[in-house]
Amino acid sequence: MSEVFLELGQRPDEAGPPINGPAAYPDDVTDRLTADAQHITARYPDARSALLPLLHLVQSEDGCLTPAGIRFCAERLDLTDAEVTAVATFYSMYRRTPTGDYLVGVCTNTLCAIMGGDAILDALQEHLDIHAGQTTADGRVTLEHIECNAACDYAPVVMVNWEFFDNQTPSSARDLVDGLRSGNPPDPTRGAPLCTFRETARTLAGLTDPHVRGGAPGAATLAGLRQAQELGMSADPDGASA
């Protein structure tokens, strides 16, 4: 039996500075975003419930959050800039610095680490000549380390704009980012084809996504369900197995 040793230490520094950038949008951008925002807020009985999708909307405009985006959300939802900023800086999916066309996240949590996640992160940092939290000079790839991609059954996992690339190795991860930088992005293991970070942010805002295709879980995810079905297992309303 082979032994696995884990060394826990400080992760590379990642972007987390104050939100910077333009303080206001040009009129044409404001008009366009306002039309989208009206479509989004109409889904909610209380407009402020639309804050998260509106933050994705302004992120789709700038590639990150800016004072202009914060102000836009605050004005549309009758909130203060401070209230919007408090929410925006709580969630890691809202970026505080300009993000490349492809946000490449490497999981380094326990299972992915055991299966090689740390080696993948180290390989990509060397291959791209950047640290986690930085962007390549061509603006194509931003690298980050992630504590969990919620895909432990396919560890080690790399995500690109939150689409899954399962069972990765240092070699396959290098090939992946090379494809992204050359303009030939590979298809994810499952889910929708890749689009740019800004296009993904627009999708997360709840606007039409022309890329969506079957999103069923993979075989490994459903292994427990299949076994339960084969054994005739079920659950009663009180939660006790039968």
Q: Residues of each region from the PLM?
A:
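Signature of N-terminal electron-transfer/Fe-S-associated modules in redox systems
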Residues: S2-A242
